[in-house]
């Protein structure tokens, strides 16, 4: 052996395996961070775009899909920023939110209710009010939802799943918001309850920033 010769000691196999696992974990974490950053950009763009809208009037189609029955009704949706909206259907059914109260004759809900902090009715009202304004991250923070986003079929699709323990098992477990990819404006809100029912609200022919009679929201 010549003086000064150094022989490399090979890494044990288990160390190599652990290093590969570590690199895989790092790659997953970096990918997740990148996705989270993309989600934040998307949610901010949706909020910025819809937050500029002061009011709108739109055609509304509501489809309630139950395991053995599907019903559809049409009507008109009115919204005035930030806390007033009315869904008025040709069937005579309705849902009206006027700041801290909601009056409903739709589905399983009939009557006038106060929108109490943290209550199920407030959560329901916020789904629509926040959705109209693109405030999906605010909805998640204020009402206890986790969020997932994807883009498909010309829509940015945001799925909000309830994680607030006090509300799990009542109301809606999942809400899906669909915004157009070309302009970030709202197209549809779909609610899923714990009984397997799906309640879809699709808006079309939207007229933005139009004057709306305040009597529309009075009750």
Which role fits each region the language model picked out?
Residues 76-127, 199:
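An acidic-aromatic
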Residues 145-219:
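Gly/Pro-enriched, hydrophobic low-complexity segments
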Residues 56-62, 73-77, 85-87:
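One face of beta-strands
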Residues 6-18:
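Short, Lys/Arg-enriched N-terminal segments with co-localized hydrophobic residues
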Residues 22-33:
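Sec-dependent N-terminal signal peptides
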Residues 39-45, 51-59, 64, 70, ...:
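Flexible, processing/modification-adjacent segments and terminal tails
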Residues 60, 85-89, 102-106, 160, ...:
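Short hydrophobic/aromatic-rich beta-strand segments that constitute the beta-sheet cores
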């Amino acid at each position: 052996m010549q003086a000064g010769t150094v022989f490399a000691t090979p890494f044990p196999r288990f160390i190599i395996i652990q290093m590969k696992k570590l690199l895989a974990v790092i790659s997953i974490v970096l990918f997740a961070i990148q996705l989270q950053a993309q989600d934040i950009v998307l949610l901010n763009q949706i909020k910025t775009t819809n937050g500029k809208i002061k009011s709108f009037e739109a055609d509304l189609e509501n489809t309630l899909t139950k395991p053995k029955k599907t019903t559809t009704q049409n009507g008109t949706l009115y919204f005035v920023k930030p806390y007033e909206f009315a869904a008025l259907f040709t069937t005579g059914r309705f849902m009206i939110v006027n700041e801290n109260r909601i009056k409903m004759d739709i589905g399983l809900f009939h009557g006038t209710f106060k929108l109490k902090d943290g209550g199920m009715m407030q959560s329901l009202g916020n789904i629509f009010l926040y959705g109209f304004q693109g405030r999906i991250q605010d909805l998640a923070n204020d009402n206890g939802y986790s969020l997932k986003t994807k883009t498909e079929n010309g829509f940015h699709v945001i799925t909000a799943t309830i994680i607030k323990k006090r509300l799990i098992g009542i109301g809606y477990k999942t809400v899906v918001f669909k915004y157009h990819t070309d302009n970030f404006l709202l197209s549809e809100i779909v609610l899923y309850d714990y009984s397997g029912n799906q309640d879809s609200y699709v808006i079309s022919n939207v007229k933005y920033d139009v004057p709306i009679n305040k009597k529309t929201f009075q009750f």
